[in-house]
A protein has these predicted regions:
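Structural signature of the two symmetry-related core transmembrane helices
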Residues: 58-73, 152-153
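A membrane-interface helix-boundary motif in multi-pass transporters
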Residues: 25-31, 134-155
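Helix-to-loop junctions at the C-terminal end of transmembrane segments
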Residues: 42-56, 139-140
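Intracellular juxtamembrane helix-capping segments at the cytosolic ends
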Residues: 95-108
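Helix-loop junctions at membrane interfaces in 12-TM secondary transporters
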Residues: 73-86
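Multi-pass alpha-helical transporter architecture, strongest
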Residues: 73-75, 149-172
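Helix-loop boundary and gating motifs at the non-cytosolic
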Residues: 1-36, 129
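Loop-to-transmembrane helix entry/capping segments in MFS-fold secondary transporters
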Residues: 26-27, 110-120
């Protein structure tokens, strides 16, 4: 949950560099941000239905694949058509947060729930604070594409390991 949260937060910070790369008029930034954030909100409304349809195992895979895939796809589509990738990413951002918090709620005793969710948010911010300067440096020294691809790897490796461990735990 923390890795996915950090991944979606990091992508939120990539939106402006992507818009700058595309030479988007600044007057459109607010419009695009608003539509992206509304996309998250509407997706969150459907998250329970989506989770019930796919179930926790498939949903975990889908979230990881679409989040990592969003970084990779955007890296290779830094065009205005690539903005559609951002919208798909933001749909999964809208699914991921309530679904993953729901899983935490199911696994946590009520007297510890607020603490666990606070620690989750702290981990997200801590991970972002740890990787953001490096990702920014990659963007400045190499390219936006490299920064996006390295971000995908930073998410995929621990995300895949932790998802695999979770599946293994649930099978035993």
């Amino acid at each position: 949950s923390g890795i996915i949260g950090a991944a979606t937060l990091t992508m939120a910070w990539f939106v402006q560099p992507v818009l700058m790369y595309l030479k988007t008029p600044v007057s459109w930034y607010g419009v695009i941000w608003t539509v992206l954030n509304l996309t998250v909100g509407f997706a969150a409304l459907w998250s329970d239905r989506v989770d019930n349809y796919f179930g926790p195992r498939k949903m975990g895979i889908l979230i990881l694949v679409f989040i990592v895939g969003g970084y990779i796809s955007l890296a290779f589509n830094l065009t205005y058509a690539g903005l559609a990738i951002l919208f798909v990413f933001y749909i999964f951002r809208g699914f991921a947060t309530p679904i993953l918090k729901g899983y935490i709620n199911q696994m946590t005793f009520s007297d510890m729930r607020a603490t666990v969710l606070s620690i989750r948010n702290f981990i997200i911010r801590l991970m972002f604070a740890a990787i953001a300067p490096f990702i920014g440096w990659l963007n400045d020294m190499y390219s936006l594409q490299i920064a996006l691809l390295v971000s995908a790897g930073i998410i995929l490796i621990p995300g895949g390991i932790l998802l695999g461990l979770q599946f293994r735990k649930n099978n035993h």
